[in-house]
Amino acid sequence: MVQKAIDFATKVHEGQYRKGTDRPYIVHPMEVGKIVSTMTQDEEIISAAILHDTIEDCEGVTAKMIEQMFSKRAAELVQKESEDKSKTWMERKGATIQHLKVAEREVQMIGLADKLSNIRDIDRDYPECGEELWQRFRMKDKETIGWYYKGVEEALRNSFSEVPAYIEYRSLVEKIFGK
């Protein structure tokens, strides 16, 4: 199932790049899957991690399609990790923080891995780009982006405080945005 998810995600993310870079987008879902695999060996969860942005960011991909190709559970996990793009950035991110506080552990794992992959990119690119880095995002204010990353850190603290991926995430949040 994991290989099938890799193949599908590679196909539907073709031609997409990480914001403000020339890195192929598929690098991100692959990293999210790898991070999740450090927390579970469940192939449905790992596959959902790899597929986590397909409904949200790939034209024509639906939950029904993922259910038919993979499983109902994988489709549900991807759907629970998808944002409502009709809402503002603040509304979406506030909803994500609230959702992660109460979501099932599997959804929290994917959320943690997604945000860890994103903040690793920020940490990697910041020394080269400096403050210009924030211009690549929809929300361009570093302080507001920091509010979001800190909110996610707090939302996941009780469930993951001893998990290496969370410890790395918390450390990068503090490094980039302060305490």
Stretches found by the model and what they are:
Residues M1-K179:
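Active-site helical microenvironments for divalent-metal-assisted chemistry
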